[in-house]
Design a protein with these regions (language model features):
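Catalytic centers of hydrolytic enzymes
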Residues: 1-178
Length: 178
């Protein structure tokens, strides 16, 4: 939690601890689905199978609505993907921003989506090039955004739902795909 008031740079180091840059990659709806399917494999803990929690490897895709039907077999857990209220077509192309850790293959997301890590033909923007090596780091981009905005009032927007059981999905009125 960041307290109200001035946000010194040290708070941004606490908020975003890694030295990352951003890449913009064009991905299809099917590649996004596979990416999210890979994330669903990280919702349990080996030491406690009843625990369904996140961590570093439970990626979300902001702006895309989707449902995680955890009870479904792997490969069929991501259902009802929509963008701007419309179903996502497998061949629909999206511009996706990811950090260099993901782009270079970190945690296997690129491979899971059928993409080759560090395939620079997939990207048309890298913040290290467009903003410079230091200014292009995520934490420095955040700092500049905060300076430009002067004041930030964070909001939370949920763009996905998680259903542990089929009964949970039905009770919520979700469209259950077998």
């Amino acid at each position: 939690l960041i307290p109200a008031g001035d946000a010194p740079m040290r708070l941004l180091y606490q908020l975003y601890v890694f030295e990352n840059w951003l890449y913009r990659v064009n991905m299809t709806g099917e590649q996004l689905r596979l990416w999210l399917e890979h994330a669903t494999t990280n919702y349990t803990s080996a030491s406690n199978p009843d625990y369904l929690g996140g961590g570093y490897y439970t990626d979300e895709i902001y702006g895309l609505y989707y449902e995680i039907h955890y009870y479904a077999p792997e490969g069929k857990r991501i259902q009802n993907m929509q963008y701007q209220g419309q179903p996502v077509a497998p061949d629909q192309v999206f511009s996706v921003v990811m950090n260099n850790y993901r782009f270079t293959g970190g945690a296997g997301f690129m491979q899971a989506a059928g993409l080759t890590p560090e395939d620079y033909s997939l990207t048309d923007m890298y913040t290290g090039d467009t903003l410079g090596n230091d200014n292009g780091q995520v934490r420095n981009i955040l700092a500049q955004y905060i300076r430009d905005q002067k004041e930030i009032t964070p909001t939370v927007e949920s763009t996905w739902q998680f259903f542990r059981t089929k009964e949970d999905a039905i009770a919520a009125g979700a469209k259950v795909v077998e």
